[in-house]
């Protein structure tokens, strides 16, 4: 457990060209419960590893970088530090940087968790009583944090890494089951909207 104004990191890459379009500042969080065989960053899995950093210091470092066209939050599993990652993502968008978030969870499960928590919270507040349905179905994910991180993400790369589906031909994904989801468009339309890319040049979503 880390203080609310901190984030536990596996590391950073201030000039990544493989974690989304353009030159990006990649932030790799520490801790992941998925345990995908063939994981690219297995040392990022233990929750007690890495180093704890203040979010405001990390945000200042990214702002001072000056070259990054966007920020990618990867890991590890960002949604297992959803509150901290959401705060970082909000600050990055306030700077005019687009945010990509990688997760081993599926968008539908994260959205359902966030929506169910919001609905249950409203019912509990109205009746002043807790409800068993408030318990999240993803025990390692904070429901309100999941909602906040989804709201602060432009593109979500979702789904676990599946070694049998691995291909080096996939842009910004490790396996073909993973999707590049335009989160603002998806949340507006109520259906999955994939982020459009061309072979040579990534299209910028209208929501950016």
Predicted regions and their residues:
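N-terminal [4Fe-4S]-dependent radical SAM core
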Residues: 1-28, 41-47, 192-193, 197-206
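P-loop/Walker A phosphate-binding loop and immediately adjacent motor/lid segment at beta-alpha junctions
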Residues: 166-208
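Short glycine-rich, flexible loops that bind phosphorylated cofactors or substrates
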Residues: 80, 164-165
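Conserved Radical SAM active-site core
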Residues: 5-10, 23, 41-136
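Short pre-active-site segment immediately N-terminal to redox-active cysteine/selenocysteine motifs
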Residues: 28-35
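Well-ordered beta-strand positions
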Residues: 153-155
